[in-house]
Amino acid sequence: MLKNLAVLLLFCSAALSLLSFQQGEVAPEDELIVKARAFLKALEKGDFEAAAKDFDATMMKVSGPEKLAEFWKQVPEKLGSFKKQTAARRDQFGGYEVALVTCEFEKVTLDARVVFDKEKKIAGFQFVPSLPPAKYEPPAYADPAKFEEREVTVGAGGDWPLQGTLAIPKGVGPFPGLVLVHGSGPNDRDETIGPNQPFRDVAWGLASRGIAVLRYEKRTRIYGPKLVADPKFASLTVKEETIDDALEAVRLLKSTGSIDRKRIFVLGHSLGGMLIPRIALAGKDLDIAGFIVMAGLTSPLPETYLRQMTYLFALDGETSADEKKQLDEIKKDVDRINALRESDAGKAEKMIFAPPAYWLDLRGYYPPDVAMKVNRPMLILQGSRDYQVTTEDFENWKKTLGGRPGVEFKLYPKANHLFAEGQGLPSPDEYSLVHGSVADTVVSDIALFILKH
């Protein structure tokens, strides 16, 4: 199987799956799920030629029919006899479409993760632990007795209404309010990844401290297929993906009676943090009180994607020939993006998950420079163990904004990209396999910043 495939598939989403227009659950008749089920059925029957018929060239070379036969021969000894396929769902990570089919064996239940490339060929396959939906584990600093949650709609009456949750302190307001803006990819309102829900941690922690927090579903999660089918997709930029909805969320808070209209803040994580300066300028008429950047990227997105993939492929100490080939393809995509002309803006083709207009819109955008135009308090937060948005990005913010009145910087030595604490070499396992709440010190620093302004 493809080395590091689990890394590539499970863990690219938090910081940079960019425009992954894909919802998590789809109907069983989905074409790729049907293909995945047929692949597994062929394995079960021992028809390895049929199982491999949809393999891409690399899979055929490294895991062709003979290798599949060897692999399947070992399954009964380790897992017990195969019993049946059950539920199926879809996912998308790192540019690959993924079908997950739950398989019951005599000894254990696992998910078959079948990976498809752009030509709908099977580019990878493995069995991974079948994880039930994780029950939310509130951090110790969250006290549900001190706040309540209500369902709201961001952008109600518009073309893209989004369901959200407002965590609001109990008692007499008005309370300061905070809007949470997602990172890359089709995030839910909690920024769920594996057993972790960092936005829910932040919302519950701050609501316990007297601050109302609004989090909402990302447009690309709810309307992914509609966005792609829209004739305007070719002109889609971060404005439609992120900025417009963030400002709608601010408007919703301003219209909520128990919220202090003059003390509404916006927090952006990862891509959301990178876009905070643009959100601030686009929302000047809303008189937003201040802004918080959590792991805000300053480097160009395409180059960052290449750097992340290089890091992930090297996690096991070496980069295989196949992985080097994949990196070469990514480099070519980066070069294509950098060679775009303004006349390419109307093209609908995807280049690293987004149309040319998306990349042209971000060309030349350097967040710290744009932040110099924002005359509001800002808090810049960064984890030292974040390999996706690095301390180099943090230093870029400091170089430009350091010493400016009203701008604060906080670096957390043990924090990863989700601002949970850990030790050792940072890897994606911390996101998908290990539960870790946003660190108490991070939530405390955010609360102090908001409450003093």
Language model regions located:
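N-terminal cap/lid segment of alpha/beta-hydrolase-fold proteins
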Residues: P132-G173
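Cap/lid segment of the alpha/beta-hydrolase catalytic domain
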Residues: V181-E241, T310-F313, E421-S432
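Alpha/beta-hydrolase active-site loop
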Residues: A234-T256
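Primarily recognizes the serine-hydrolase "nucleophile elbow" in alpha/beta-hydrolase
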Residues: E248-L312
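Short solvent-exposed beta->alpha transition segments
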Residues: V34, K45, E49-G94
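Accessory cap/linker subdomain of secreted extracellular hydrolases
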Residues: Y223, L286-K373
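Catalytic active-site module of serine/aspartate enzymes centered on a nucleophile-bearing elbow/loop
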Residues: A415-L418, G424-H453
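Short beta-strand/loop motif that positions the catalytic acidic residue
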Residues: V374, I380-Q382
